[in-house]
Amino acid sequence: MDSNTVSSFQVDCFLWHVRKRFADQKLGDAPFLDRLRRDQKSLRGRASTLGLDIETATRAGKQIVERILEEESNEALKMTIASVPASRYLTDMTLEEMSRDWFMLMPKQKVAGSLCIRMDQAIMEKSIILKANFSVIFDRLETLILLRAFTEEGAIVGEISPLHSLPGHTDEDVKNAVGVLIGGLEWNGNTVRVSENLQRFAWRSRNENERPSLPPKQKREVAGTIRSEV
């Protein structure tokens, strides 16, 4: 096993521990708590893949971080912070909407890269809106936290979420996943809209109805594949 992989995991475990202590003191805001929960699942998946104990890794990570801080000057720390581009966190959903449990009468699921697409194919002829919480950097979608499809009544009928065992996705990955979800929902006669944030960052082109248009390749494929894909 590569030593950098192990040490990276150890440092991530310790930094998560520090953030958890911060949250336990009721100091974290909603985006902070969202990332904390997401990263916890990711660390558990990585621990299983690497065959490492999280508690032991956390202690080792603490030693690594302490050694770095001992060598770091205040001036170097200021320069490092200033050189890191800041990302923005955009929220369409409340914490309650993100954490709410939901179930499907006719569940369908598709894994697309590191994203999992789920929808309830029992939902027909409804007006649906897609909402998402995600970060943006350099005016591009950086990381999708969670996307959910809601009916006008507030019921959750679809979802796109990162697979924590396969970290990493691009804005194009999200765009394609949204296209698959929209195609699956529309197949059953539903009308789908997306939030303004998604229109701006997940789709660059729109049709005359102000709904994101599918990429040409997906327009050809959705009708023939969505029933088996989603």
Curated annotation (Swiss-Prot):
Keywords: Eukaryotic host gene expression shutoff by virus, Host cytoplasm, Host gene expression shutoff by virus, Host mRNA suppression by virus, Host nucleus, Host-virus interaction, Inhibition of host innate immune response by virus, Inhibition of host interferon signaling pathway by virus, Inhibition of host PKR by virus, Inhibition of host pre-mRNA processing by virus, Inhibition of host RIG-I by virus, Inhibition of host RLR pathway by virus, Interferon antiviral system evasion, RNA-binding, Ubl conjugation, Viral immunoevasion. Residues 218-230 have a biased composition (Basic and acidic residues). A motif (Nuclear export signal) lies at residues 137-146. Residues 1-73 are annotated as: RNA-binding and homodimerization. One of its GO terms (cellular component) is host cell cytoplasm. Homodimer. Interacts with host TRIM25 (via coiled coil); this interaction specifically inhibits TRIM25 multimerization and TRIM25-mediated RIGI CARD ubiquitination. Interacts with human EIF2AK2/PKR, CPSF4, IVNS1ABP and PABPN1. It is found in: Host nucleus; Host cytoplasm. The dsRNA-binding region is required for suppression of RNA silencing. A motif (Nuclear localization signal) lies at residues 34-38. Upon interferon induction, ISGylated via host HERC5; this results in the impairment of NS1 interaction with RNA targets due to its inability to form homodimers and to interact with host EIF2AK2/PKR. GO terms for biological process: symbiont-mediated suppression of host cytoplasmic pattern recognition receptor signaling pathway via inhibition of RIG-I activity; symbiont-mediated suppression of host gene expression; symbiont-mediated suppression of host mRNA processing; symbiont-mediated suppression of host PKR/eIFalpha signaling; symbiont-mediated suppression of host type I interferon-mediated signaling pathway. GO terms for molecular function: protein serine/threonine kinase inhibitor activity; RNA binding. This is Non-structural protein 1. Belongs to the influenza A viruses NS1 family. Disulfide bonds: none annotated. Inhibits post-transcriptional processing of cellular pre-mRNA, by binding and inhibiting two cellular proteins that are required for the 3'-end processing of cellular pre-mRNAs: the 30 kDa cleavage and polyadenylation specificity factor/CPSF4 and the poly(A)-binding protein 2/PABPN1. In turn, unprocessed 3' end pre-mRNAs accumulate in the host nucleus and are no longer exported to the cytoplasm. Cellular protein synthesis is thereby shut off very early after virus infection. Residues 206-230 are annotated as: Disordered. Residues 223-230 are annotated as: PABPN1-binding. It comes from Influenza A virus (strain A/Swine/Iowa/15/1930 H1N1). Residues 180-215 are annotated as: CPSF4-binding.
